[in-house]
């Protein structure tokens, strides 16, 4: 093939991509009413992500600790309050009973939220392709505010912990936090170029870590000083603020269609077409494999996160609220270190190998945490996980690049659905595995999680080699050295 022909082909491809990008830009910027207010800073959905994550991370360990305290009162256990939590009480039957009850109630609450929110996430995410992204940010924020209000009612009136499940279901009816994730990542896909998408996604995920770090530090100290109620008032206010910000400041990227209906089978059909179409050839298999990797990585992350507080509360660590807050802050600090590491590694490594480094960091950290019997060793495990979030931005970006611009909403709706499934599976597996393995190895679930991560590592490595080989063959076919 002549060099002139090669140049013409590449120019034509570039022109078609540019024209498609231009069309996309016009589609998302014209004929839409601007928000009531304009933000002077060059940010869009980042504050929504930050505020929603702040509320979730602030309430999650407090809910677990509240369940622990309420269930301890029910069975008459007061080991952590009287200083009885030490190495000699590892086999205390009351402590084991409280751990088991707390793990099971966490399972029931997460299961209830998942079953209700599963289909709502798909509906809301795909619906946003026609109705607009802002609604998918506002509705779940209001649902999370209702959940916080129910939790406050339980604490004020000392209602049975069953009412926590009711609050979780209320949040699930609005799409829960996963709908906010879907809306935010679809928004970034609308407004970013292919070359910069991985880093833009990583910035959005860094908002998760920054908010989580602040919430963890504040939550532990605040709960120790004033109990549970005041922090949950902040959770309520934060969710309302997120909804208000999305309404006032976030520009719309999709022209709203007045005919768009939320409850329609077309949303599920769009997702089915996305995963059944094999044009271009090979796309479908890559899409399924990357979704499988994403499912396994997020399942391990959520499953282990659910157990950290239980693991730290009981012997031999016996952490109080302050140390639990610092531990959660250290875990969320890894979001920021992962962002920095990802940016640095992109200078010399392809995205697939960046993801492998992140998975390796995660596996090593989990193994150390599984044998942690001192505070120093536990924080060492957290420190070794400093790149553990480098893999998920790569996976989201690769999935986004496999589909057309008009399919981004359906894609991230399905990804959000997978995240909901991850929440269910992680709760079912890890919260059941933890009490079942207490008698022979307390940290076994973390070793199990590290072993599971070997699967996505192998898949990502294999696909990375295949993509590199295909890229080399394409260059040779065009006569490009």
UniProtKB/Swiss-Prot annotation:
Keywords of the record: Cell membrane, Cytoplasm, Disulfide bond, Endosome, Folate-binding, Glycoprotein, Membrane, Symport, Transmembrane, Transmembrane helix, Transport
Residues annotated as transmembrane: 46-64, 103-128, 133-155, 161-174, 198-223, 229-247, 287-309, 323-345, 352-371, 376-396, 409-434, 443-461
Protein topology in the membrane: Multi-pass membrane protein
Presence of the UniProt keyword Cell inner membrane in the record: no
Cysteines engaged in disulfide bonds, as pairs: 85-318
GO molecular-function term, one example from the UniProt record: folic acid binding
InterPro entries listed in its UniProt record: MFS, MFS_trans_sf
Extracellular side: 65-102, 156-160, 224-228, 310-322, 372-375, 435-442
GO annotation terms (biological process): transmembrane transport
Catalytic activities: folate(in) + H(+)(in) = folate(out) + H(+)(out); (6S)-5-methyl-5,6,7,8-tetrahydrofolate(in) + H(+)(in) = (6S)-5-methyl-5,6,7,8-tetrahydrofolate(out) + H(+)(out); methotrexate(in) + H(+)(in) = methotrexate(out) + H(+)(out); pemetrexed(in) + H(+)(in) = pemetrexed(out) + H(+)(out)
Coiled-coil regions listed in the entry: none
Cytoplasmic domain ranges by topology: 1-45, 129-132, 175-197, 248-286, 346-351, 397-408, 462-481
Subcellular compartments: Cell membrane; Apical cell membrane; Basolateral cell membrane; Endosome membrane
Stored Pfam families: MFS_1
Known glycosylation sites: 78, 86
Binding site for H(+): 176, 205, 301
Function description: Proton-coupled folate symporter that mediates folate absorption using an H(+) gradient as a driving force. Involved in the intestinal absorption of folates at the brush-border membrane of the proximal jejunum, and the transport from blood to cerebrospinal fluid across the choroid plexus. Functions at acidic pH via alternate outward- and inward-open conformation states. Protonation of residues in the outward open state primes the protein for transport.
Family: Belongs to the major facilitator superfamily. SLC46A family.
Quaternary organization: Monomer.
Protein name: Proton-coupled folate transporter
């Amino acid at each position: 093939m002549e060099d002139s022909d090669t140049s013409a082909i590449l120019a034509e491809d570039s022109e078609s991509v540019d024209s498609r990008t231009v069309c996309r830009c016009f589609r998302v910027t014209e004929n839409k009413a601007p928000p009531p207010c304009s933000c002077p800073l060059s940010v869009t959905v980042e504050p929504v992500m930050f505020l929603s994550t702040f509320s979730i991370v602030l309430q999650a360990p407090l809910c677990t600790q509240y369940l622990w305290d309420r269930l301890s009162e029910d069975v008459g256990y007061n080991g952590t309050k009287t200083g009885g939590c030490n190495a000699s009480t590892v086999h205390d039957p009351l402590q084991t009973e409280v751990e088991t009850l707390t793990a099971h109630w966490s399972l029931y609450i997460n299961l209830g939220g998942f079953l209700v929110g599963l289909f709502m996430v798909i509906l809301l995410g795909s619906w946003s392709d026609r109705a607009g992204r802002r609604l998918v940010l506002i509705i779940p924020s209001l649902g999370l505010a209702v959940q916080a209000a129910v939790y406050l009612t339980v604490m004020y009136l000392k209602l049975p912990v069953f009412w926590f499940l009711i609050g979780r279901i209320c949040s699930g009816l609005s799409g829960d936090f996963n709908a906010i994730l879907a809306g935010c990542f679809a928004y970034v896909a609308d407004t970013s170029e292919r070359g910069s998408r991985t880093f833009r996604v990583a910035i959005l995920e860094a908002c998760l870590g920054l908010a989580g770090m602040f919430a963890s530090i504040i939550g532990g100290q605040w709960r120790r000083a004033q109990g549970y109620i005041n922090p949950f008032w902040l959770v309520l206010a934060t969710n309302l603020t997120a909804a208000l910000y999305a309404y006032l400041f976030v520009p719309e990227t999709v022209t709203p269609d007045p005919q768009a209906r939320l409850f329609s089978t077309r949303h599920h059909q769009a997702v089915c077409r996305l995963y059944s179409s094999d044009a271009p050839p090979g796309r479908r298999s890559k899409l399924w494999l990357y979704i499988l990797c994403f499912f396994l990585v997020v399942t391990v992350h959520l499953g282990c996160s659910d157990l950290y507080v239980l693991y730290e509360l009981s012997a031999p660590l016996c952490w109080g609220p302050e140390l639990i807050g610092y531990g959660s802050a250290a875990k969320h600090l890894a979001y920021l270190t992962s962002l920095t590491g990802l940016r640095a590694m992109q200078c010399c490594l392809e995205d697939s190998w960046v993801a492998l480094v992140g998975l390796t960091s995660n596996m090593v950290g989990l193994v150390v945490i599984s044998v942690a019997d001192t505070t120093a060793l536990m924080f060492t495990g957290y420190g070794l996980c400093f790149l553990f979030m480098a893999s998920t931005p790569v996976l989201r970006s690769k999935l986004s690049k496999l589909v057309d611009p008009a399919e981004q909403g359906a894609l991230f709706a399905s990804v959000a659905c997978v995240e909901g499934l991850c929440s269910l599976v992680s709760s079912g597996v890890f919260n059941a595995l933890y009490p079942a393995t207490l008698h022979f190895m307390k940290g076994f679930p973390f070793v199990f999680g590290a072993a599971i991560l070997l699967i996505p590592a192998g898949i990502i490595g294999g696909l990375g080699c295949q993509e590199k080989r295909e890229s080399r063959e394409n260059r040779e076919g065009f006569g490009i050295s």
